[in-house]
Amino acid sequence: MQAYFDQLDRVRYEGPQSTNPLAFRHYNPDELVLGKRMEDHLRFAACYWHTFCWNGADMFGVGAFNRPWQQPGEALELAKRKADVAFEFFHKLNVPFYCFHDVDVSPKGASLKEYKNNFAQMVDVLAAKQEQSGVKLLWGTANCFTNPRYGAGAATNPDPEVFSCAATQVVTAMNATHKLGGENYVLWGGREGYETLLNTDLRQEREQIGRFMQMVVEHKHKMGFQGTLLIEPKPQEPTKHQYDYDVATVYGFLKQFGLEKEIKVNIEANHATLAGHSFHHEIATAIALGIFGSVDANRGDAQLGWDTDQFPISVEENALVMYEILKAGGFTTGGLNFDAKVRRQSTDKYDLFYGHIGAMDTMALSLKIAARMVEDGELDKRVAKRYAGWNGELGQQILKGQLSLGELAQYAEQHHLAPVHQSGHQELLENLVNRYLFDK
């Protein structure tokens, strides 16, 4: 097979002084950070959809890219050609993982039966590619939002027959993920929401999607899948309002249906932006709630109201994200998947490498800065000092339920409490973070 990226052998680490645009300056897979290999901390993955499925089309223009596997031809043969190029890319980029939707890797076919047959053939192709390359599957998922049948949602659709079609795709994609050794399975509700409340029964749709997720959990245990189930929050787009709005909303949903011990979250930076949150906020919230799973590493544009899916380039933002992840013990089954695409004007095939290399270097440098923050411990010390009162007798009595509201009021009066506000020192802490970021 002729190489598609024929001007490149493999992307390698050359160090911070390198000016080679096809080399890593900060990502050194074998470098030890806090006693652990950088590759094992970051667990990078490249995604199939933006990298190999998007043809450069947008709402105002047709496809701008010249990808051989996107030309007219026999669907399965083109899918196999796409797989050839994808695994060439994964190998040359030196990522240990990849991610896909079902219809990214396999033709959808004209019927559910044809869909399943096509997918089964492509799973065998992917299994062989994984064996040859050593690249593993971080997670798989089903695209239950592109087909016109899902215009009113999949699990939240008013038609139970559409719900059943979605179940077919999800069970097939879960089985494929399991067979390929995937470490997670993701559920993103692209159209699980509404356009208008005038034709929407919120209680009904919530019950439907709750039951759907319960069925997914049941199937996971039935098939013996040991990976993690993940919901990916997003507030809107393509619907006006989605039910998985943000991490906190997802947690409330999981609690309602008794799923908080079964499903975690896959957090995308751009989705946090759309929800009016920082990426840091969503990561910290998931960790605090015990549902942190994996990350879609990208960036949005705060001046735009849609999902731009750009590659992450902000060390300032991502150092704080990696700091939270390190403090929480790091990834288990999750990782950093680049849910990002080159711009429509970036028509050189090597732009795919430039985008990923920059993103990987950004996250690697962020990791190293976060490690310095952890080792220094100053931020943790200051937070602990701020809440120290809760480790005292009064604080512990309150938290352990040993005082009622009335008893606490009586205590305050008897002890003539008149506490004085203590400074939060926000500016000092911001300066401290800048020292980690910019001082050698």
UniProtKB/Swiss-Prot annotation:
GO MF: magnesium ion binding; xylose isomerase activity
Cofactor: Mg(2+)
Catalysis: reaction(s): alpha-D-xylose = alpha-D-xylulofuranose
Binding site for Mg(2+) 2: E268, H271, D307, D309
Alphabetical keyword list: Carbohydrate metabolism, Cytoplasm, Isomerase, Magnesium, Metal-binding, Xylose metabolism
Cofactor detail note: Binds 2 magnesium ions per subunit.
Residues annotated as the enzyme's active site: H101, D104
Enzyme Commission number: 5.3.1.5
GO biological process: D-xylose metabolic process
Gene Ontology CC, one term: cytoplasm
Disulfide-linked positions: none
Gene3D superfamilies xref list: Divalent-metal-dependent TIM barrel enzymes (3.20.20.150)
Main location: cytoplasm
Residues the record lists as binding Mg(2+) 1: E232, E268, D296, D339
Cell compartment(s), UniProt: Cytoplasm
Family: Belongs to the xylose isomerase family.
Subunit composition and interactions: Homotetramer.
PANTHER family named in the record: PTHR48408, XYLOSE ISOMERASE (PTHR48408:SF1)
Record protein name field: Xylose isomerase
Organism: Salmonella typhi
